[in-house]
Regions:
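Ubiquitin-like/PB1-type beta-grasp interaction modules and other compact soluble beta-rich domains
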Residues: 1-98
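N-terminal, polar/charged subdomain of small-to-medium soluble alpha/beta proteins
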Residues: 5-9, 13-15, 74-82, 86-190, ...
């Protein structure tokens, strides 16, 4: 037998009742077998159902249902999300110290003006910005604040990969994604994307692609608190190839 560490995120953490747990499995067990074991345990019906449409990571890398697990592996359970190398130059997110560019997570307020100004270079003809802010209502309910959490190691990897792909796909010069974590009030920036390019067309296209893809693939979750309650945002399902599901029961007999 072997033991693996399971890390549920977002609504799964609320339903499963722990930020991490150790699960004992037979040697050579797969991700699918782990999910089957969890689904068969004492979990709420809605949790067991959601386990059939999540993504799973093993040691901060996306995994397939067929991947074999090893003793000591860290397995992330990732419900649908809300929502190259980094250049050497650095930038400030808020009032803290400078950090490597392209992909940043921060608990500090995002200083959008500073980041946009830092993105402009002499060879650029356009800088396109997506500034996602917290609005005061959602689906007819008055919003008090949002709380964001992330599987931080995997989220930064995915964000860096998105900026690298955007540069290659759209021919832009540079891109930066900054996402806020923790509690965010109405009117504050939750996510900032800044794209720099010689021409406006590629800059617009890259910026739209970055936010749309981030909302589907980066493990960041949003909990919305209203005047009359709180709920985890349903979010975007993971695309085919990232989501996993335990195998259906065999009908052979």
């Amino acid at each position: 037998m072997m033991q693996v560490r399971v890390l549920p995120f977002g609504v799964l953490r609320d339903w499963l009742g722990a930020s991490s747990a150790t699960v004992e499995l037979p040697e050579g067990a797969t991700v699918a077998e782990l999910l089957e074991r969890l689904s068969a345990g004492q979990v709420p019906p809605q949790s067991a159902q959601l386990l059939r449409s999540i993504a799973v990571s093993v040691n901060a890398e996306f995994a397939t249902s067929a991947q074999e697990l090893r003793a000591g592996d860290e397995v992330g359970l990732l419900p649908p999300v809300s929502g190259g190398a980094a250049p050497a130059e650095k930038t400030r997110v808020g009032g803290g110290e400078e950090q490597p560019r392209t992909a940043l997570l921060t608990h500090a307020p995002i200083d959008a003006e500073r980041l946009i100004a830092a993105a402009k270079k002499g060879e650029d003809g356009a800088v396109v910005v997506f500034d996602g802010i917290v609005r005061n209502n959602s689906h007819g309910r008055r919003t008090l604040y949002l709380d964001y959490e992330a599987y931080e190691e995997l989220a930064v990897k995915q964000m860096r990969e998105l900026t690298r792909e955007a540069i290659e796909r759209f021919g832009i010069r540079d891109a930066l994604i900054v996402h806020r974590l923790g509690r965010i009030r109405v009117g504050e920036t939750s996510v900032l994307i800044v794209v720099s390019a010689a021409h406006r067309g590629p800059a617009f296209e890259a910026c739209r692609w970055l936010i749309d893809t981030l909302k589907k693939t980066v493990p960041i979750w949003k909990k919305e608190t209203f005047v009359d309650g709180a709920v985890w945002a349903a979010g975007e399902p993971f695309p085919a190839g990232l989501s996993v599901a335990p195998p259906e029961a065999s009908h052979e007999g």
